[in-house]
Regions:
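Catalytic cores of DNA base-excision repair glycosylases
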Residues: 161-167
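N-terminal beta1-alpha1 cap of cysteine-dependent amidohydrolase-like domains
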Residues: 1-108, 116-118, 124, 128-160, ...
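The feature captures the ABC ATPase H-loop/switch
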Residues: 112
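Active-site-proximal beta-strand elements of phosphoester/diester hydrolases
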Residues: 206-209
Length: 237
């Protein structure tokens, strides 16, 4: 049985900004509310994170700045931005916990990268350097752009969306360099960049490199991802 009739959905937030405020784009919160969930924000530096997540019915690891390359044996790049060691530390702890506990989890953009890095995976530090720019994954200087996604037939994501091909909002300059042990790549961009992964041993752990929250208010297809995690939370996975 689920813990709550209206599921509590944890969302990680950005680190402190110049005004000493923790923030999170409203699109994440709105998408969870539309799905019938109650958003619970988890900011970096939360020392009692375990007490918080033990009350949750699901967790969303949100997008944001780059992960410290030291976490995956990478190197600093001139395009790195938003590196936040406090946020890295919290989200990697959360990722370990949800992978062990079975809590329904959705990773979005940075969240997908956190999950991969937590299990020993690596990242491409800057997509144009290695993959090229046949497909843009963000518009200059750092704005969202749309491109195609192709999902693996029969994957959990393909079942959620009810189709295997669609356009999605992209906003990243880094990507997964292969998948960590236990993950399966189930979505790709036309240039071969990994766009979605699932943890095969987990009851419900999905991560996407694109940003479904950006268009979910006007695109029912992207809202389905939030509907799906809230529904899974209701079932008490």
């Amino acid at each position: 049985m689920p813990r709550h009739q209206d599921p509590l959905i944890g969302l990680t937030t950005y680190g402190r900004n110049a005004d000493n405020r923790f923030t999170l784009p409203a699109e994440y919160i709105d998408a969870v509310r539309r799905a019938g969930g109650i958003p619970v924000l988890i900011p970096p530096g939360e020392s009692h994170w375990k007490a918080v997540v033990e009350t949750l019915d699901a967790l969303i690891l949100t997008g944001g700045g780059d992960i410290d390359p030291g976490r995956y044996g990478g190197r600093r790049h001139e395009t790195n931005y938003g590196i936040d060691l406090e946020r890295d530390a919290l989200e990697i702890e959360l990722a370990r916990w949800v992978m062990d506990s079975g809590l329904p989890t959705l990773g979005i953009c940075r969240g997908a990268q956190v999950l991969n890095v937590t299990r020993g995976g690596k990242l491409i530090e800057h997509i144009p350097d290695e993959v090229g720019e046949r497909i843009l994954h963000r518009a200059p200087p750092r704005e969202p752009i749309a491109h195609g996604i192709r999902l693996k037939a029969g994957s959990r994501l393909a079942r959620i969306f009810g189709r295997e091909e669609f356009e999605a909002a992209s906003w990243h300059h880094q990507a997964l360099r292969g998948v960590a042990e236990g993950f399966e790549a189930v979505g790709h961009a036309p240039d071969g960049t990994i766009e979605a992964i699932e943890l095969t041993s987990h009851p419900w752990l999905i991560a996407v490199q694109w940003h479904p929250e950006l268009t979910a208010a006007s695109d029912p297809l992207q809202q389905k991802l939030f509907d799906a995690i809230v529904e899974e939370a209701r079932r008490g996975s």
